[in-house]
Amino acid sequence: MAFISQRRIDFPMVDLAKVVYYPRFWDLAHRFYEESWEFTCGMHYNEILFEKKIAFPLVHSEAKFLHPISYGDTVECTITVPRIGETSITWHYEFRNQHGTLCWTADQVTVCTDMNEVKSKMAVPDWMRECLAKIESS
C-alpha cells in the first residue's frame, strides 16, 4: 500500500513561466511527508517531533523532473518506503498531475535522531517500523 494525497498548485509556488519553481518540489514533498505520518502512525508530525522527541533530518535526496506542473494543476503525491534501515528510512515520492502524467520522482533518505541530540543517530523505534509497514514497498 502507499500513502496518496492531493494538493492544488497555488500562485506562490510557481515561477514566471507559471510552472512549479524547482525548490518548491521539495517543499511539496515535505508537506506530503508530514501528512503521511497521520496515515501511517495516526499522529501529526509535530507529535513525533515534540512529544516523542524524534527528528528525521534529510541526508540524501535524488530527483527526476519529468514533466512541468502548472499553476492551478492538482498534484497527486504517492509515497512509499522502500527501505527501513537500523537508523534510516528511504522514502520514494511520485508526483502526477490531474491527467495522471508522472511529473517528478524522488528518493530521499532521512536519519532517525533524538531531538535533544540531533547530531546523534538513533535506532528507528519498533512502533514506528510497524506503522511505516503500511507504506513499505519491496
Feature map (PLM): residue ranges:
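HotDog/MaoC-like acyl-thioester-processing domains
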Residues: 69-71, 81-138
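Hot-dog-fold acyl-thioester-processing enzymes
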Residues: 1-59, 113-138
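Hydrophobic beta-strand-centered segment that forms part of the acyl-chain substrate-binding groove
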Residues: 38-76, 82-83, 88, 103-105
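Preference for bulky hydrophobic residues occupying beta-strand positions
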Residues: 7-9, 63, 79, 93, ...
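Generic hydrophobic/packing signal
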Residues: 14, 22-23, 30-35, 69, ...
